Amino acid sequence: MNMKTVKCPTCGKPVPWTPESRYRPFCSERCKQIDLGAWAAEQYTIPVVEDDDLPPDAPGGESGGASGRLN
């Protein structure tokens, strides 16, 4: 049987995709914490698409808080 593996998003090391892989998709607690720290330091962003066609009462409209929508 072929075991599916994925690359650790932090270091690229192959990680078996099994329930026994405690930190998947990361290879270790260290790589998991490095990734969490990058999110906390705002090194990663989620792109936002500005949408001028939103009605004012729609989420993200003029009265709905932040403008734009997640892409």
Curated annotation (Swiss-Prot):
Biased composition (Gly residues): 61-71
Record-level Gene Ontology MF annotations: DNA topoisomerase type II (double strand cut, ATP-hydrolyzing) inhibitor activity; zinc ion binding
Pfam families tied to this protein: YacG
GO terms (BP aspect): regulation of DNA-templated transcription
Keyword tags: Metal-binding, Zinc
Keyword Metal-binding belongs to the record: yes
Record text on cofactor binding: Binds 1 zinc ion.
Cofactor: Zn(2+)
Chain positions covered by the region annotation Disordered: 48-71
Transmembrane segments: none
Assembly mode: Interacts with GyrB.
Family of this protein: Belongs to the DNA gyrase inhibitor YacG family.
Protein name: DNA gyrase inhibitor YacG
